[in-house]
Curated annotation (Swiss-Prot):
This is 3-methyl-2-oxobutanoate hydroxymethyltransferase. It is found in: Cytoplasm. Catalyzes the reversible reaction in which hydroxymethyl group from 5,10-methylenetetrahydrofolate is transferred onto alpha-ketoisovalerate to form ketopantoate. One of its GO terms (cellular component) is cytoplasm. Its EC number is 2.1.2.11. It comes from Porphyromonas gingivalis (strain ATCC BAA-308 / W83). PANTHER family: 3-METHYL-2-OXOBUTANOATE HYDROXYMETHYLTRANSFERASE.
Amino acid sequence: MSTYQPEDTRKVTTHRLIEMKSRGEKISMLTAYDYSMAKLVDEAGMDVILVGDSASNVMAGNVTTLPITLDQMIYHGKSVVKAVKRALVVVDLPFGSYQGNSKEALCSAIRVMKETHADCIKLEGGEEVRESIVRILSAGIPIMGHLGLMPQSINKFGTYNVRAKEEAEAEKLLQDAHLLEELGCFALVLEKIPAELATRVASELSIPVIGIGAGGGVDGQVLVMHDMLGITEGFSPRFLRRYANLANEIDRALKHYIADVKSMDFPNKDEQY
């Protein structure tokens, strides 16, 4: 398995991502939610760190992303930003913080930027959130869009199945993708859509298109850290590649520690003052 060390250690910006697309360099993106893990992810050379509303699932144990609040997202965002020197930090606007009206959306985005010091925000949707996008961008806040499977709309769709397989939905996705670029979004996430459609979107847009379950024809890839490191169990979508099995490693370490405490093997004389 190959490893990577970035040659350019300068801070990644939204403009750098667009430059990376123009020269054909793929963009690496991963979630992080706390200081310690964000520091490791950043030092590894990740281009983008997403403080995702998936924290609702992997950090809080919720079934969906819907329960997480703006205050909670800001807490996680603050923790991550403190650790990061190079990567671009993106914070998700959670469900209910921008769908109501554009004023509410702007207030939410401003809070995220002021309180976390993140580089930009991400939100889900196309035409239906046009006014919110325009209002946020007018305040000088960069936006990463998100189309395809949109977890905040799980109650509307009912499943986490692949989206945009039918012609009508695929056409709407194409229209929304172009709209997001025209409005001024600097990048777009496509989740769980046919690879051929995702490749077409990436080829038609000048902004970076980052996929999760969208094939290899896009400009970059994003995964949830807990999934790719093998911390979460019982979740194996087709698009997920596990690069470690930390759940087993952690289990072994914990049981070893418990055994050493019970047997009085820990602490030994060298581990005392």
